[in-house]
Amino acid sequence: QTTRITAIAIDLNGKSVATRQRTLPYRNNDAYYQRMNGIINDFAQELAKQGSTVRGVAFCMQGIVSADGQSITFGKIMNNTGLKLNELSHGLNYPSLMIHDSDASAMAELWFDHNLKDAVCIYLERRPRGAVIVDGSLYQGPNQCNGSIEHMTLIPGGNTCYCGQQGCMDTYCSPETLMEDGESLPGFFSVLEQGEQEHRERFSQWLDYVALAVTNIRSVLAVT
């Protein structure tokens, strides 16, 4: 499995000032993390040459982070359950922390919209995910897993999810479910725009599942 590492430098106003992307064959081991941190260190050094000071590094992870922020308590997607921050950051020259990627996205929403008070953020990416905002702040809950909407049961006894349960939202609302074997997502929408009936039906069914998920969320959390 090949992973894409995206390093983004954010200034204190929340503006992206530089980006670097690299691909690495993924392994949940020390060698992989050292190579990754080498990329980050090089990126930070280039920023320093341009007059910037790097204050720290946030690892945005597809996994549930422990309450103390020191380990991954549930990491099925990356197969890294139990990964500790000191292992992840080995060889890194800067202070660091771990955060669930959806929580990081929600914090960005708050940064750019100071009027945002109560909301559920829904991110329909390859692996759908969410985050909860209450009274203008990210609300992660005692186990740091508030907003894990992708694992609500949408269809009882339905498709098997990577988490081991059946019928999770992820298995019905992931954009991957729109594609047939060998089809790309842009390819799907290209055919959809041409009005092909089977693609229209598939997209309509997907929208129904997404709407059902939103309805379930709103029945629990009264947000607008």
Please describe what each predicted stretch is.
Residues 1-53, 112-113, 156-160, 165-224:
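ATP-binding/phosphotransfer module of carbohydrate and carboxylate kinases, centering on a glycine-rich
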Residues 3, 62-64, 125-127:
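Short glycine-rich anion-binding loops that position phosphate/pyrophosphate groups of nucleotides
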Residues 12, 101, 124:
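Cofactor-binding loop segments of dinucleotide-utilizing enzymes, especially the Rossmann-like FAD-
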Residues 12-13, 67-68, 134-135, 156:
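Short, ordered coil/turn segments that flank beta-strands lining enzyme active or ligand-binding pockets
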Residues 16-118:
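Glycine-rich phosphate-binding loop and adjoining helix at the ATP-binding site
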Residues 116-172:
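Glycine-rich phosphate-binding loop of actin/hexokinase-like ATP-binding domains
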